[in-house]
């Protein structure tokens, strides 16, 4: 999708850009594939904030996405390409030969009228889903399962892609967008191609109001707070941190601290850690 830039007619639109949405063919979602979405405002069941900077935003309906791609051997036609407010990628509405409709994440190049399918022996074309053991080495993939039959969990955001590097024993080795090399079972499914809406990362928000529409609240610097609210707070004017290293609001090290568990069970599947 192309990027549309605005003339600086006001401070709000100066430098602002939006996606052109020229790929979108339908503006209203398939009603049978949507459910209501209750907002939490970042609060848990006790009403306490557990994730900061969330709240407000436009009302949304959640689109039910088919991450399992388990209708093997049944062809589907792409009926429409739609916008999904719940994710960065666009979604494609499929209609199968038996009449069932499902949403999938739109890969690059998938358009209305294309035919896609899933199964062990389908063609290697964008949008088709098949087990990793049947995908040639060097192929670009997305929507990758981590456990057989659980549904895709990896490489789902706009513009993301992974590459199948090798196969050995029961596992395939993939290079993920982070640079991590990871082992995935050969029976796990993946979808051929790169996730669409590549231009998403080039969008400039431009003004605070657009972030509020997305449900994002302001991120306040610790140095702008009082000492009671943050370890960086207080002082006269622009005071330094006053500590050996930056801290989180709860007093823990903010930079450089490893947050992954050292003895995590899945560590054995990581061949090479991600690039920093």
Curated annotation (Swiss-Prot):
One of its GO terms (cellular component) is large ribosomal subunit. It comes from the Bacteria. Coiled coil: none annotated. It holds the Pfam family Ribosomal_L2_C. GO terms for molecular function: rRNA binding; structural constituent of ribosome; transferase activity. GO terms for biological process: cytoplasmic translation. InterPro entries: NA-bd_OB-fold, Rib_uL2_dom2, Ribosomal_uL2, Ribosomal_uL2_bac/org-type, Ribosomal_uL2_C, Ribosomal_uL2_CS, Ribosomal_uL2_dom3, Ribosomal_uL2_RNA-bd_dom. SUPFAM superfamilies: Nucleic acid-binding proteins, Translation proteins SH3-like domain. Residues 218-276 are annotated as: Disordered. Keywords: Ribonucleoprotein, Ribosomal protein, RNA-binding, rRNA-binding. Residues 258-276 have a biased composition (Basic residues). Belongs to the universal ribosomal protein uL2 family. Part of the 50S ribosomal subunit. Forms a bridge to the 30S subunit in the 70S ribosome. One of the primary rRNA binding proteins. Required for association of the 30S and 50S subunits to form the 70S ribosome, for tRNA binding and peptide bond formation. It has been suggested to have peptidyltransferase activity; this is somewhat controversial. Makes several contacts with the 16S rRNA in the 70S ribosome. This is Large ribosomal subunit protein uL2. It comes from Finegoldia magna (strain ATCC 29328 / DSM 20472 / WAL 2508).
């Amino acid at each position: 999708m192309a990027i549309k830039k605005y003339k600086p007619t006001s401070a709000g639109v100066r430098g602002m850009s939006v996606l052109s949405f020229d790929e979108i063919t339908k503006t209203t979602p398939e009603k049978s594939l949507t459910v209501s979405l209750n907002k939490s405002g970042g609060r848990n069941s006790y009403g306490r904030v557990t994730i900061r900077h969330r709240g407000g935003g436009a009302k949304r309906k959640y689109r039910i996405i088919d991450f399992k791609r388990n209708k093997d051997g049944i062809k589907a036609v792409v009926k429409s390409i739609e916008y999904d407010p719940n994710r960065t990628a666009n979604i494609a509405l499929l209609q199968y030969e038996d009449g069932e409709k499902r949403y999938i994440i739109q890969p690059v190049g998938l358009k209305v009228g294309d035919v896609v399918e899933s199964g062990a022996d389908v063609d290697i074309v964008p949008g088709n889903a098949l087990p990793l053991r049947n995908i040639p080495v060097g192929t670009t993939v997305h929507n990758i399962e981590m456990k057989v039959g659980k549904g895709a969990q990896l490489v789902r955001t706009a513009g993301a892609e992974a590459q199948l590097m090798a196969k050995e024993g029961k596992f395939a080795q993939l290079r993920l967008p982070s640079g991590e090399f990871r082992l995935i079972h050969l029976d796990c499914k993946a979808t051929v191609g790169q996730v669409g809406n590549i231009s998403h990362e080039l969008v400039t928000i431009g003004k605070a109001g657009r972030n509020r529409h997305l449900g994002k609240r302001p991120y306040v610097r610790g140095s702008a707070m009082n000492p009671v609210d943050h370890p960086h707070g207080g002082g006269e004017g622009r005071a330094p941190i006053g500590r050996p290293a930056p801290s989180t609001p709860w007093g823990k090290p903010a930079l450089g601290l490893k947050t992954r568990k050292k003895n995590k069970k899945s560590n054995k599947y990581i061949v090479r850690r991600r690039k920093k």
